[in-house]
Swiss-Prot record:
Name of the protein described by the UniProt record: TATA-box-binding protein
A single MF term (Gene Ontology): DNA-binding transcription factor activity
Family statement drawn from the similarity comment of this UniProt entry: Belongs to the TBP family.
Signal peptide (from-to): none
Keywords attached to this entry: DNA-binding, Repeat, Transcription, Transcription regulation
Gene name per UniProt: tbp
Length: 181
């Protein structure tokens, strides 16, 4: 049975083809904040889709908080349209690259994190962080496993990698259980 894996955050980046006057952009974009003494980029928050866009003077744009790459592209295109309507010369449909995805799922059991921490590529310091950190090399992701059975997978570039990583973890946990009990 396939696990139910939910994408909870997608971070993408793009280059919109020209330098941006951030002071001007902050004036014309709704929900934009530009405080260069605190952060070098303009922060623009949209409600539909619910994302935050970081726009930099160089024309680099990052979108975070999306639930899918498609939502991120929709948000980027909304901002591009607003900037174009204000007279800025910006390319249509720039290439959008996924930088990171975060997914969540459940193990369906309450794991013994102390036992799992004996495996290579794991870190578990419950005084500092309640989850066990498990670093996989293929796919290159970080899996956080909590005592409740909740699992967070970060560092994803593709949704398929979440399933591969989760199935590797399940296989490893079954092998560990057979060894220990």
């Amino acid at each position: 049975m396939e696990p139910e894996i939910k994408i909870v955050n997608v971070v993408v980046s793009t280059q919109i083809g020209t330098d941006i006057d951030l002071e001007y952009a902050a004036d014309i974009l709704d929900n934009a904040e530009y405080e260069p003494e605190q952060f070098p980029g303009l922060v623009c928050r949209l409600s539909d889709p619910k994302v935050a866009l970081l726009i930099f003077r160089s024309g680099k744009l990052n979108c975070t908080g999306a639930k899918s790459k498609d939502d991120a592209v929709i948000a980027i295109n909304k901002i591009i349209k607003e900037l174009q309507e204000a007279g800025m010369d910006i390319i249509d449909n720039p290439e959008v690259n996924v930088q990171n995805m975060v997914a969540t799922t459940e193990l369906g059991m309450e794991p013994n994190l102390d036992d799992i921490s004996t495996l290579e590529c794991t870190e578990y310091e419950p005084e500092q962080f309640p989850g066990l950190v498990y670093r996989l090399s293929d796919p290159k992701v970080v899996v956080l496993i909590f005592g409740s059975g909740k699992v967070v997978i970060t560092g994803l570039k593709r949704i398929d990698d979440a399933y591969v990583a989760f199935n590797k973890i399940l296989t490893t946990l079954k092998e560990l259980e057979e060894e220990l009990y």
